[in-house]
């Protein structure tokens, strides 16, 4: 919903269509073609590992920006560096990398218009406050006999 505040047209690509989603839901390649800002918010699974690769990057607009705050291996770093250096996309902002701490060999280290933060996107006060609220709610639920987010 934050993108709405900036007047952005939001397009969603997900394995399972969310109920009552106010946004257009489409496949990942169509989303990549339409995107001015393509952001990733997914877990690392066998299906998502290397998902952002030459195929997706090749259909993006030359003015598009890629943002990854999910998991580093979702992005193929060599393909992204090539897309940035050949100006197939405009920029990338990454809070996660394939290897952390950053490998001295990553091609993203010298890629054009690539900004890398040290896995701290969660560190804003508001985010940490929300995290504490969730933990407290989970403890209250557990004490009340209704545990949440069980891992058995």
Kindly label every feature range from the protein language model.
Residues 9, 15-107:
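Rossmann-like adenosine-cofactor binding region
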Residues 5, 33, 65, 92, ...:
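Intrinsic disorder/low-complexity signature
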């Amino acid at each position: 919903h934050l993108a709405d505040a900036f007047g952005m047209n939001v397009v969603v690509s997900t394995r399972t269509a969310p109920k009552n989603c106010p946004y257009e839901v489409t496949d990942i390649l169509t989303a990549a073609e339409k995107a001015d800002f393509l952001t990733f918010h997914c877990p690392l699974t066998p299906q998502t590992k290397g998902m952002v690769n030459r195929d997706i990057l090749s259909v993006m607009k030359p003015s598009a920006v890629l943002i990854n705050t999910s998991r580093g291996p979702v992005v193929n770093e060599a393909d992204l560096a090539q897309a940035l250096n050949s100006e197939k996309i405009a920029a990338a902002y990454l809070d996660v990398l394939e290897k952390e701490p950053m490998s001295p060999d990553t091609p993203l280290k010298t890629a054009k218009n690539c900004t890398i933060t040290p896995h701290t996107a969660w560190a804003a006060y508001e985010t940490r406050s929300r995290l504490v609220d969730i933990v407290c709610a989970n403890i209250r639920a557990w004490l009340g006999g209704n545990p949440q987010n069980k891992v058995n």
